[in-house]
From Swiss-Prot:
Signal sequence segment: 1-26
Topology feature Cytoplasmic, residues: 71-81, 140-205, 258-267, 321-339
Keyword Cell membrane included in the entry's annotation: yes
Membrane topology field: Multi-pass membrane protein
Keyword entries, A-Z: Cell membrane, Ion transport, Membrane, Signal, Transmembrane, Transmembrane helix, Transport, Zinc, Zinc transport
UniProt name for this protein: Zinc transporter 5
């Protein structure tokens, strides 16, 4: 049942965003601020876009599946040194994606001269990113609280049942009663520890699902941007940058999925959704390229809002759920060498993704 609900939610987000862009493409455009050169070679751009679909798909699959290979290779399992270093790299990638790729895009769209009126003088991009980050915190907090309370109630029922069983022994003597009570108390401690572990597991799963939603929103937008582009130079640059972009983002999401200890079906569904989102976005962009005008006010608002919200989600997730959680982990805190390696990996990941901002 939970898997079905997750699939429906992801499908809803994906198709809602896709249909939103199709609806935008059907609208009239009266702004001539940023049309591409009329002499752009559409045929030249098309070959790059067609090649990008399988290439970006393969890059996404490689990226998201690499951390999931921990089931077969012990060195890739969560809480190993290699996993911490790899996850720090992925966190740097996601942080740079939010700050260097998505947020500037949002600012560019929502501050375009094509948007007339005093209302657009308000810094909507930063405001929307802030609200998205707060909402992500709320989802994180309330979901964790819900699972914590659910496991506390379950542990309490088990403890009450054991006490009733112990009381029903009656004439077994004080020694036997003491033994049963001690035994029940031990089970209570184990139950509490198990409950805390389950709460943390559920929180990790919530983090993975929220992160995937943020990535999907951004991936659809950037995929449609490539698909709708009419310039061969733009398409070529986006093609190359998107391959690395998709691979690195997949690395971060795959690490989060691996820690969530999902079942095989959930892993498959989440991996497929991540991998196909950008290629399908490219296909949608190609389909609407003849009528889509990314300089129309409606298109600018839609892209700006989605980019700003996605940036808020990605920045929050990278700082709070990736970096803060891992860098404060007891294993990291007790190992100076691991801390240095993780910091270097973080800087490399953020640096590489920041460099890619020149092209995508």
């Amino acid at each position: 049942m939970r898997i079905t609900q997750n699939v429906k939610l992801l499908l809803f987000f994906f198709f809602f965003i896709s249909f939103l862009f199709i609806a935008v493409s059907a609208g009239e455009s009266k702004c001539e601020c940023s049309h591409e050169d009329d002499e752009a070679n559409k045929a030249g751009a098309k070959k790059y876009k067609i090649a990008a679909i399988p290439s970006v798909l393969a890059a996404g699959v490689i990226g998201v599946m690499f951390p999931l290979l921990g089931k077969f290779f012990p060195s890739l399992k969560p809480e190993t040194t290699f996993f911490f270093v790899t996850k720090a790299f992925a966190a740097g990638v996601i942080l740079a994606t939010g700050f260097m790729h998505v947020l500037p895009e949002g600012y560019e769209k929502l501050t375009s001269p094509c948007l007339k009126g005093e209302a657009w003088e308000f810094p909507f991009t930063g405001f929307i990113a802030m609200v998205a980050a707060i909402l992500t915190l709320s989802v994180d907090s309330f979901a964790t609280s819900y699972f914590h309370k659910a496991h506390f109630k379950t542990s309490k029922r088990i403890g009450d049942g054991e006490e009733q069983d112990a009381g029903g022994g009656g004439g077994g003597g004080d020694e036997l009663g003491l033994h049963v009570h001690a035994h029940g108390h031990t089970h209570g401690i184990v139950g509490v520890e198990s409950g805390e572990s389950q709460v943390q597991l559920h929180r990790t799963r919530v983090v993975a699902q929220v992160l995937e939603v943020g990535i999907i929103v951004h991936s659809v937008v950037i995929g449609i941007s490539l698909g709708a582009s009419q310039s061969p130079d733009t398409a070529k640059a986006l093609f190359a940058a998107l391959m690395f972009h998709q691979c690195f983002e997949g690395l971060g999401l795959g690490g989060c999925i691996a820690q969530g200890n999902f079942n095989c079906m959930s892993i498959t569904i989440m991996s497929i959704f991540f991998s196909v989102t950008t290629p399908v976005g490219i296909a949608v962009g190609m389909a609407i390229s003849s009528s889509y005008d990314d300089s129309s006010p409606t298109a600018l608002i839609v892209q700006g809002v989605l980019n700003a919200a996605s940036a808020g989600i990605l920045i929050y997730m990278s700082l709070v759920d990736f970096l803060a959680a891992d860098f404060m982990h007891p294993k990291m805190q007790s190992n100076t060498r691991l801390q240095i390696m993780a910091h270097i990996s973080l800087l490399v990941g953020a640096g590489v993704m920041s460099l890619l901002a020149k092209w995508a």
